[in-house]
């Protein structure tokens, strides 16, 4: 189980930025993440939105805030992201 004194490097975790669309749950926020991808044949940039649940320990984020998320271990049946920081508060 021990690594014999050698440092084991951890893989880099995904970091995404998105907007909070719901904060009604305790210690959980729903964040809309935008993914831009170029169409393979036509070259048009397509936008796709994905909603993910993220862990917000201190309940600091509110609806409309721009937040930074980091991928983490599964925290519940649907939570795999955690809040790193609130980049910009909603007006």
From Swiss-Prot:
Keywords: Ribonucleoprotein, Ribosomal protein, RNA-binding, rRNA-binding. Coiled coil: none annotated. The keyword Disulfide bond does not apply. InterPro entries: NA-bd_OB-fold, Ribosomal_uS17, Ribosomal_uS17_bact/chlr, Ribosomal_uS17_CS. The keyword Transmembrane does not apply. Pfam families: Ribosomal_S17. It comes from the Bacteria. GO terms for biological process: translation. Part of the 30S ribosomal subunit. This is Small ribosomal subunit protein uS17. It comes from Saccharopolyspora erythraea (strain ATCC 11635 / DSM 40517 / JCM 4748 / NBRC 13426 / NCIMB 8594 / NRRL 2338).
